[in-house]
Amino acid sequence: MNMLALTIILPLIGFVLLAFSRGRWSENVSAIVGVGSVGLAALVTAFIGVDFFANGEQTYSQPLWTWMSVGDFNIGFNLVLDGLSLTMLSVVTGVGFLIHMYASWYMRGEEGYSRFFAYTNLFIASMVVLVLADNLLLMYLGWEGVGLCSYLLIGFYYTDPKNGAAAMKAFVVTRVGDVFLAFALFILYNELGTLNFREMVELAPAHFADGNNMLMWATLMLLGGAVGKSAQLPLQTWLADAMAGPTPVSALIHAATMVTAGVYLIARTHGLFLMTPEVLHLVGIVGAVTLLLAGFAALVQTDIKRVLAYSTMSQIGYMFLALGVQAWDAAIFHLMTHAFFKALLFLASGSVILACHHEQNIFKMGGLRKSIPLVYLCFLVGGAALSALPLVTAGFFSKDEILAGAMANGHINLMVAGLVGAFMTSLYTFRMIFIVFHGKEQIHAHAVKGVTHSLPLIVLLILSTFVGALIVPPLQGVLPQTTELAHGSMLTLEITSGVVAVVGILLAAWLWLGKRTLVTSIANSAPGRLLGTWWYNAWGFDWLYDKVFVKPFLGIAWLLKRDPLNSMMNIPAVLSRFAGKGLLLSENGYLRWYVASMSIGAVVVLALLMVLR
């Protein structure tokens, strides 16, 4: 257990070494340092896990030093290990190591090879700080760290202005959520005098027993932070554009780890949310709406990575739904299995993109199953897990637990939303697979091979099957137990969800394996074009936010750039200057001008006297 800090220190050392190498190292040396540091962190995590189970799954705390101490305000840099943080740590370092190994192959020949691994090592260190922190402020440090790394990696190919814009968009939108999280910190410390997770849960019931509604505001702010980082409604607009980064980044940050940080935040502060059931129910509604909207958006995308981005948004929606119906174990279980099959799909999509000479439009591909059979198998298994194909995939078991939790706790409407989402998931997933790997070959794909390419894919492929579902997160005693569904009802639900998934796959085969005449006619109809455009543009949220927030903000910025306050202060000076110029013109030395001026002045004075009388 004393090795807990090494899971942060090792990737941090890798970051420092790679950063100071300034690209002078060869790709092999950079890969050894970048991949090796994360691999060692994963190995340390394995030792920690063995020790954790050997000691009866007891919560362990490792104080490192006092971070801040001002009067009564004391924040320690303390790490905590329990079943929840161990699960997250295993996902971050384990799946992270596999993705780093794959990236050492994928990024070969790219400019900034060592810079890439420096950023990803810093990300792993920040993510580990986030999941091991024993207090909200230390978690916030890791939270901001992963946000910075996300920005750097989305804009990795910074010479293209579009990538820079995508990075800035992700940074700004997620910062909105971070502001909400900061407000939550202020409220909770002001009310409870501590930010330690355990102490907050212990003090909250007595402190808020008198009906103080500040706890509701605090949990709403926590939810605001969670939806920003986890790309949920209404702060979901950044994730699809984040696909501008290298594909291993999409797998590491925007599928398996960082985007699930919001789920972890709510799970870690579950004691506070249980005291505000209205906010907890809102969490479930946010998840249900997001999973449906993202599912329809994924159905019409043409970019292979954007399909997977919207599917990520949708699957995190399932996790939020699970949290909202108090199916805590199911949420974390799905977080883990999702990391397996979504990392597999993203890495396999990277192989497709390289094999097709960096083409990402699925309609310009086709017939690739013969050229890259291993990648095709990865897509089949990963797609089946994403679609929750019954019995043989990890996704089936975790998603069914979520639906069972919703049904057992009386949230039938959310369960129905989950079933509709399951149908949409299987439909858009196998639409992508059938278009890319079946039909007529439209592009000559070259073979992709190599140990560092194939080994991570094979490991993730195995974990995406029912084998991954055998890994049960040790959450007993950390999160409240989920209400269990009666055996008969559970069997009915499993059959129903299985049928829904299979029907979605069969419908996808009928629509996209043949000549696609029906799909074409629907797409070319007036309603089809309207809905297709609407869904393709993610329900118009970007357009709405541009009109409501971006354009007014830019208008205000344009106005402030010209310093209106200073201009107003100059008005008296300008008027005085014009008056002075007028008086100078009147002093011209002509007698007739003076007589005329006096006459006009006299007439004006007489007129005023007559009017005022």
From Swiss-Prot:
Q: What is its EC number?
A: 7.1.1.-
Q: Which Pfam families match?
A: Proton_antipo_M (PF00361), Proton_antipo_N (PF00662)
This chain belongs to which protein, by name? NADH-quinone oxidoreductase subunit L
Q: Periplasmic face: residue ranges?
A: 1-6, 53-74, 134-210, 268-281, 326-338, 398-413, 473-494, 608-613
Top-level EC class, please? translocase
- InterPro entries linked to this entry: NADHpl_OxRdtase_5_subgr (IPR018393), ND/Mrp_TM (IPR001750), NU5C-like (IPR003945), Proton_antipo_N (IPR001516)
| Compartments, record wording | Cell inner membrane
